[in-house]
């Protein structure tokens, strides 16, 4: 059984304001700064119907400082501002910045699991309807093959000569584990960690009747993976509606139609 990291993360509600030094952590004119980029991406995800009704979340690791930036809980994601961000020191699990009005994201222990077990640069959590539908259709795994968009997803392997990541090929099968939902978000941590151990090459975990967690070595990669996987989940759902197994071989679909 996986050891749980959640006891190392302070997820208590903030009760104080922020000093000017705290505000410096989220004040930048650079649109690529994590505090700014989280706002941009959350608005984009909102209009994709991935984070409606305050659901979902996102976290980005600062590439220079290593600080973890996390969107707060219970906030309409399309209205987020940089000043709304929590900032965490990953080494201690304590907050360097706590906005006065908001609670830490309940996703925080799961985000930290991805940072620690996958060395992620960013983690995205959406309430994608395609993820929910796939979790109702499939049991322990989503398996899909022979679809062009699979080539956007990493295989978990590296090129022996260059050391660069190798993506899946058109003919490969993408496998995404599915874990059962819990009454409280933070209680998903152990199930997520077990999936990370059992599926060392996966870059996503679907949560049944809930949504999906997707991560990558950078925020750009995580965004690409999330978009590609959502597309593939929609294709898998529609293939199932036609009676076609999403991982069927090329040409085999004809016998199901």
Curated annotation (Swiss-Prot):
A single GO CC term for this protein reads: cytoplasm
> What is its cofactor?
Zn(2+)
The positions annotated for binding substrate are 107
Keyword list (alphabetical) reads:
Amino-acid biosynthesis, Cytoplasm, Lyase, Metal-binding, Methionine biosynthesis, Zinc
Cofactor remark: Binds 1 zinc ion per subunit.
User: Which residues does the entry assign to the active site, renumbered to this chain?
Assistant: 148 (proton donor/acceptor)
One GO term in the molecular function aspect is:
zinc ion binding
Please report any disulfide bonds recorded for this protein chain, giving both cysteine positions.
Answer: none
Subcellular localization is given as: Cytoplasm
Record-annotated residues binding Zn(2+)?
A: 125, 127, 210
Q: What class of enzyme is it?
A: lyase
This entry's Enzyme Commission designation comes to 4.2.1.109
Reaction catalysed?
5-(methylsulfanyl)-D-ribulose 1-phosphate = 5-methylsulfanyl-2,3-dioxopentyl phosphate + H2O
Give, as in the UniProt entry, the pathway in which the protein acts.
Amino-acid biosynthesis; L-methionine biosynthesis via salvage pathway; L-methionine from S-methyl-5-thio-alpha-D-ribose 1-phosphate: step 2/6
Query: What is an annotated GO biological process for this record, any one?
Result: L-methionine salvage from methylthioadenosine
Q: What does this protein do?
A: Catalyzes the dehydration of methylthioribulose-1-phosphate (MTRu-1-P) into 2,3-diketo-5-methylthiopentyl-1-phosphate (DK-MTP-1-P).
HAMAP family, per the entry: Salvage_MtnB_euk
Q: Which family does it belong to?
A: Belongs to the aldolase class II family. MtnB subfamily.
Q: Which PANTHER family match?
A: METHYLTHIORIBULOSE-1-PHOSPHATE DEHYDRATASE
Query: Which protein is depicted?
Result: Methylthioribulose-1-phosphate dehydratase
Organism classification, top ranks? Eukaryota, Fungi, Dikarya, Ascomycota, Saccharomycotina
């Amino acid at each position: 059984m996986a050891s749980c990291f959640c006891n190392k993360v302070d997820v208590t509600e903030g009760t104080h304001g922020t000093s000017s030094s705290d505000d410096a952590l989220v004040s930048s004119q650079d649109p690529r700064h994590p505090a700014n980029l989280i706002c941009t991406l959350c608005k984009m995800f909102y209009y994709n119907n991935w984070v409606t009704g305050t659901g979902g979340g996102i976290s980005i690791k600062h590439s220079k400082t290593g600080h973890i930036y996390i969107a707060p809980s219970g906030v309409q994601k399309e209205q987020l501002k940089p000043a709304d961000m929590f900032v965490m020191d990953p080494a201690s699990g304590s907050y360097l910045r706590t906005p006065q009005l908001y609670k830490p994201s309940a996703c925080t222990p799961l985000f930290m699991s991805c940072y620690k077990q996958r060395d992620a640069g960013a983690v995205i959590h959406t309430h994608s309807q395609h993820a929910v539908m796939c979790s109702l259709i499939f049991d322990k795994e989503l398996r899909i093959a022979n679809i062009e968009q699979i080539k956007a997803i990493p295989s978990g392997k590296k090129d022996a000569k260059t050391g660069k990541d190798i993506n899946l090929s058109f003919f490969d099968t993408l496998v995404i584990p599915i874990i059962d939902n819990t009454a409280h978000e933070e209680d998903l941590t152990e199930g997520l960690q077990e999936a990370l151990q059992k599926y060392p090459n996966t870059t996503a975990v679907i949560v049944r009747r809930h949504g999906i967690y997707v991560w990558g070595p950078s925020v750009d990669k995580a965004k690409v993976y999330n978009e590609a996987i959502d597309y593939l989940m929609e294709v898998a759902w529609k293939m199932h509606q036609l009676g076609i197994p999403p991982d069927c071989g090329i040409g085999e679909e004809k016998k199901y139609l």
